[in-house]
Amino acid sequence: MGQPRAIGIIPDGNRRWASLRGENLYIAYYTGYRNVKRILTYIRDFYPAIRSVYLYVLSRDNCSKRSRAELSILYRIMRRSIERDIAEIEKGGASLVIVGDINHPNLPDNIRESLAPYHFDMYLKKGSLPDGRRVVAGLCYDPFWEIEHYTPKTLPSRLLDEIDLVIRTGGEKRLSSFFPLLTRYAELYFIDKLWPDFTREDLDRAVQWFSTRRRPMGR
C-alpha cells in the first residue's frame, strides 16, 4: 500500500497541554493553530500524493457546549488569521472547503462572513467543487446536520474524497463524529501525543504505518 490520497486530522489535546504546562488556553490553542500550519505546509511540500487534508476544527457539539470564554479564545485566533491563512492555502495550490453549520448562533458574524465564500454550499451554487488539492475544514460539523441539510445527491460526503487515513492525537480512541460517511474504510491511527507536540516525524510515522496496512475495502 502506498501513500494515502486523503487524510483526516483530529488535533486533540490542546487543553490538556495547557494544564500540564501551566499555560493559559490562548497559548495552548495558538500553539496548536501554529502546528496546524506547520503540518499543512509539510504535507504540501513533501507529500504530493496527498490530495485532500480534512481538519476537525470544531464539531457542532463543541460550538454548542464549550464555554463562551473558551470559544472566544478560538474565535479570536481565527479572526486574526483567516484571511492570511486562506491566502497561504491558495498560494500553495490548494483550495479551502468549509463543511458544517456556519449559521450556528455561537459562530461570530465576522467569521461567518469571511468563510462563507469557501463553504461547501457556495461551491454547490457555482456547480462544482474546486479541482486539485483541498483543505477541508469541519466547522460546527455534525453528520446529522449534514444529512438534514442536503439532499442525497448533494451530500458533502458523496462529493468529497473518501478519507484513507485518520490521525487523532491526544490518546483518545474514537472518531467523535468525524466525517463518518467518508471514513468507512479509513485506517485509524491514534497517538498519545497532544496536538501541540505533534511533529512532522510523527506524521511520517503515521504515513509509513499506513503503507503497511492491507486494505480489502469490502472485497
Swiss-Prot record:
Q: What domain of life is recorded for the organism? A: Archaea
Q: Set out the biological process GO terms recorded for this chain's protein.
A: polyprenol biosynthetic process
Which positions bind substrate?
13-17, 59-61, 66, 168, 174-176
Keywords, comma-separated and alphabetical: Magnesium, Metal-binding, Transferase
The record lists the membrane-crossing segments as none
Report if keyword Chloroplast is assigned: no
Q: How is the cofactor bound?
A: Binds 2 magnesium ions per subunit.
Cofactor(s) for this protein?
Mg(2+)
Q: Which reaction does this chain catalyze? A: geranylgeranyl diphosphate + 7 isopentenyl diphosphate = tri-trans,hepta-cis-undecaprenyl diphosphate + 7 diphosphate
Tell me a Gene Ontology molecular-function term this record carries: magnesium ion binding
Active site positions, chain numbering: 12, 62 (proton acceptor)
Annotated EC: 2.5.1.89
Q: Where does Mg(2+) bind?
A: 12, 187
> What is its quaternary makeup?
Homodimer.
Function as written in the Swiss-Prot or TrEMBL entry: Catalyzes the sequential condensation of isopentenyl diphosphate (IPP) with geranylgeranyl diphosphate (GGPP) to yield (2Z,6Z,10Z,14Z,18Z,22Z,26Z,30E,34E,38E)-undecaprenyl diphosphate (tritrans,heptacis-UPP). It is probably the precursor of glycosyl carrier lipids.
| Assigned protein family | Belongs to the UPP synthase family.
This protein's name: Tritrans,polycis-undecaprenyl-diphosphate synthase (geranylgeranyl-diphosphate specific)
Q: Gene name?
A: uppS
